[in-house]
From Swiss-Prot:
Cystine residue pairs: none
MF GO annotations: structural constituent of ribosome
Protein name: Large ribosomal subunit protein uL29
One Pfam family per UniProt: Ribosomal_L29
Recorded GO CC terms: cytosolic large ribosomal subunit
Origin species: Streptomyces griseus subsp. griseus (strain JCM 4626 / CBS 651.72 / NBRC 13350 / KCC S-0626 / ISP 5235)
Biological process annotations from GO: translation
PROSITE patterns referenced in this protein's UniProt entry, alphabetically: RIBOSOMAL_L29
Entries under Gene3D superfamilies matching the protein: 1.10.287.310
Entry keyword set: Ribonucleoprotein, Ribosomal protein
Family label: Belongs to the universal ribosomal protein uL29 family.
Amino acid sequence: MSAGTKASELRELGDEELLNKLREAKEELFNLRFQAATGQLENHGRLKSVRKDIARIYTLMRERELGIETVESA
């Protein structure tokens, strides 16, 4: 995933693609945490952005589950 995937980009994805993005983000978060624990992590801000991406994906999945439509502001 890129550094901070936008919610509007995620809304364009299907359910299966969204699950794949979630799986990739969780795997990346695991690897980043491992690097941080061993002192090899250079970009600590990446941890925060990956966690936020995961939260965006979960939020979007919940919105779809509840049938909530979001209105994009201009």
